[in-house]
Amino acid sequence: MKNFQKGIINKVRKITLITFLFLFLSPLVNSEVMENPFFTEYETNFKIPPFSQINEDHFMPAFIKGMELHNEEINDIIENKEEPSFENIIVAMERSGSLLSRVSAVFFNLSGSTTNPKIQEIEKEISPKLSSHYDSISLNPEIFKKVKILWENIDNFDLSLEERKILEET
């Protein structure tokens, strides 16, 4: 009987420890996602930013994460071994960087309309980083090669007038 009781006590201890660890560690893992509204889809009417939930401390982590994700998406385009096409180059580039675009749209609209010292500090810090980020994409020789292939073969693609115009100006 004693072994049976010890076994139950050990199981209860393990369950208690696991429960404690889960309850203690899970908020640490997900706290950034739960607290930063940029890291989730907007659950507002018309998907407008939830301005009442956004504060200045959300911007830098969202900008940094947005640039990281954007770089990953651009690297996927570069590493794509398929024959370059309008879809896998131009459309993929246009669709990339959605988090960065969302954060930038909110931040720069706020900085232009209701600025404060904290917003100005963030703007001063993030502007050169964004410039460098976008320059690294625009001046990337691998992206340039792929776009050049498309541009040189523009007449071989079945492009709409809009797609043709986009490619001509890329």
Locate predicted features:
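Bacterial N-terminal signal peptides
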Residues: 16-27
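Zn2+-dependent metallopeptidase catalytic domains
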Residues: 31-170
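Bacterial N-terminal signal peptides that target proteins for export
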Residues: 4-17
